[in-house]
Each structure stands twice: as C-alpha cells, then as structure tokens.
UniProtKB/Swiss-Prot annotation:
Protein name from the UniProt record: Large ribosomal subunit protein bL9
Family annotation (SUPFAM superfamilies): L9 N-domain-like, Ribosomal protein L9 C-domain
Xref: Pfam families: Ribosomal_L9_C, Ribosomal_L9_N
Any one Gene Ontology molecular-function term assigned to this protein's record: rRNA binding
C-alpha cells in the first residue's frame, strides 16, 4: 500500500515522503496513529505543493540571512564597556548583550541564538565572532570591545 508520511519515521522516511509499505502495517499502525495517510491523488498533489512552498520559503530565508550577514560584516562593531585595570571588563559581554547591541546598531533584529560564542568576553580587544543564521548561513563578524575608564 502506498502511504504519505505525516511525521518522520526512523527506518522508513521523512515527513512528506511517499512510501510503499505492507497493507497491515499501514492499516493497523501508521494510519491509526496519525503517522501516515493513504496516498490518494489529492494527497499526492497537496504534498507536492507543500514541498514547493517549503523550498521557496527556505530560499527566501537563506537570501535574507545572507543579506543580514553582509550588512554585519561591512563594519567593525565597537562595543563600549566599563573596564578596570589591565583591560578587564566589569562583568562580561555575552551573546545576549551582543545581540542587543548588534540589533540596535544595524537596525536588523539579531537573535542571540545566531551568535556562537564559547564563553563570554571579559577583556577589551578585537574579536572574530562566528554567526550561524537561519538557512545554514555561516560567517564571522568583527567586534571590538572599547574600554571606558571608570572615573
């Protein structure tokens, strides 16, 4: 029996795949649990249309992410921070702080999950920060922590 998978099933396929399975497996397990539907003409057309829409949406997401990354890579982002002796920060610069600063400076909403930092930055200096944007877009931006002497 041909079925269209509604959810990912290990060993069989992914959501939207059309698979040939044994009749009993489809009738007694997959269909009653909402894991698959019988592959009718209407269902096949609907799945194809959904795949086309999903691919189109992914292309748009990737293009938008590439534009955001290019915008961020155009400049060195200066981050003012209060420092003590030896260039040590009072506190630390985390991905949350950095996302807020980048969002404010670039005018584009930057999610903290896009910023890949192993640990918070605690000293002044120039840093290469890895970005992982939606759509599989990756790149690095430059961030410079500039000290403001506490007075």
């Amino acid at each position: 029996m041909k079925v269209v998978l509604l959810k990912d099933i290990p060993g069989i396929g992914k959501t939207g795949d059309m698979k040939e399975v044994k009749d009993g497996y489809a009738r007694n397990f997959l269909i009653p649990r909402g894991l698959a539907k019988m592959a009718t003409e209407g269902e096949i057309k609907r799945i194809r249309n959904e795949k086309i829409l999903k691919e189109h949406k992914e292309d748009l997401t990737k293009k938008k992410s590439e534009e955001i990354l290019k915008t961020l890579q155009k400049q060195i982002h200066k981050v003012p921070a209060k420092v003590g002796g030896g260039g040590k920060l009072f506190g630390a610069l985390t991905s949350t702080n950095l996302s807020e600063i980048l969002s404010k400076n670039s005018g584009v909403e930057i999610d903290k999950k896009w910023i890949n930092m192993d640990k918070p930055l605690k000293e002044t200096g120039l840093y290469d920060i890895e970005m992982r944007l939606p759509g599989g877009v990756r790149g690095t931006i430059k961030v410079e922590i500039v000290g403001e002497e506490k007075g």
